């Protein structure tokens, strides 16, 4: 494990270094130290590369605001930046978020999907909330209204999706769970806690590795390919990581089998590789496909340690 951690905290990927220090090693950093780490993230690729493509008006790709085209426009760049560790303290990021809020959020707090798919799809609502929370918008009304909308729609529909013939959608449940995990327990109201419980119950009620969630179509091969960053789809690693962040432990047999599956994909040198990539679809590539991945290795190692799956 020491060799793997040493690799993860190398200077060439300040984002993974930051998350490894804070989420795996649990190092307590004061504000000054955290600010320095965040500055490193901001000044290095791929964050700096994404920021360099931003137009003066605050947008990317085109001055239109929606979830389409996938992975190219303003929403997606800000979403990727949030995953990489950027925050609202970056003026240009805050400027872009204000454009997204002004042009995409409905009066109900939701972020409707248009174009090829339509409606308040739960996967995109979860991703948007995760983005806002990661960037540091915890207290803003636009965040709380989205969180409330998600809790209400989950209470009514329980993760059902019209594009899954009204069956419950595990991808949507994972995206929502990832977002709500970011809210400190002491700041969760009963609706947030109930939504987390519903997501956990649904995801664990079906075999994660077999992916035997209700469906009409064949299961997606994406479920078995570890990837970062993910779009609206999900995989076994992201699902397992979200459940563990929600407090689930390896004593659960379903989760333990998923952890075993993740462990079986470990390379001989103790790392994990990127098995699917959005490179070529995004404006800026992140790592390399079919090569050892610091991001995939970070999520796998964090899942093992937090779940107490095994001594590494």
Label each residue range with its predicted role.
Residues 1-312:
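Preference for long, amphipathic alpha-helical scaffolds in soluble/luminal domains
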């Amino acid at each position: 494990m020491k060799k793997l951690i040493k690799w993860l905290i190398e200077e060439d990927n300040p984002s993974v270094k930051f998350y490894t220090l804070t989420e795996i090693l649990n190092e307590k950093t004061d504000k000054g130290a955290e600010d320095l780490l965040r500055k490193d993230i901001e000044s290095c690729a791929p964050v700096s590369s994404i920021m360099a493509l931003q137009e003066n008006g605050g947008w990317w790709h085109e001055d239109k605001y929606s979830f389409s085209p996938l992975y190219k426009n303003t929403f997606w760049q800000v979403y990727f930046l949030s995953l990489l560790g950027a925050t609202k303290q970056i003026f240009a990021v805050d400027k872009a978020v204000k454009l997204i809020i002004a042009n995409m959020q409905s009066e109900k707090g939701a972020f409707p999907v248009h174009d090829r798919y339509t409606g308040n799809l739960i996967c995109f609502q979860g991703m948007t909330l995760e983005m806002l929370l990661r960037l540091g918008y915890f207290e803003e009304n636009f965040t709380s209204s989205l969180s409330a909308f998600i809790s209400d729609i989950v209470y009514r529909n329980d993760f059902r999706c019209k594009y899954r013939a009204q069956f419950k959608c595990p991808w949507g449940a994972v995206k929502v769970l990832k977002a709500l995990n970011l809210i400190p327990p002491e700041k969760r109201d009963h609706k947030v806690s109930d939504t987390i419980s519903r997501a956990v119950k649904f995801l664990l009620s079906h075999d994660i590795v077999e992916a035997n969630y209700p469906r009409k179509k064949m299961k997606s091969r994406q479920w078995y390919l570890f990837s970062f960053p993910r779009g609206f789809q999900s995989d076994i690693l992201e699902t397992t990581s979200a459940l563990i962040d929600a407090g689930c432990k390896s004593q659960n047999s379903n989760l333990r089998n998923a952890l075993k599956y993740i462990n079986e994909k470990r390379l001989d040198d103790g790392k994990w590789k990127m098995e699917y990539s959005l490179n070529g679809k995004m404006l800026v590539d992140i790592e390399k496909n079919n090569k050892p991945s610091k991001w995939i290795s970070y999520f796998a190692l964090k899942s093992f340690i937090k779940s107490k799956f095994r001594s590494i």
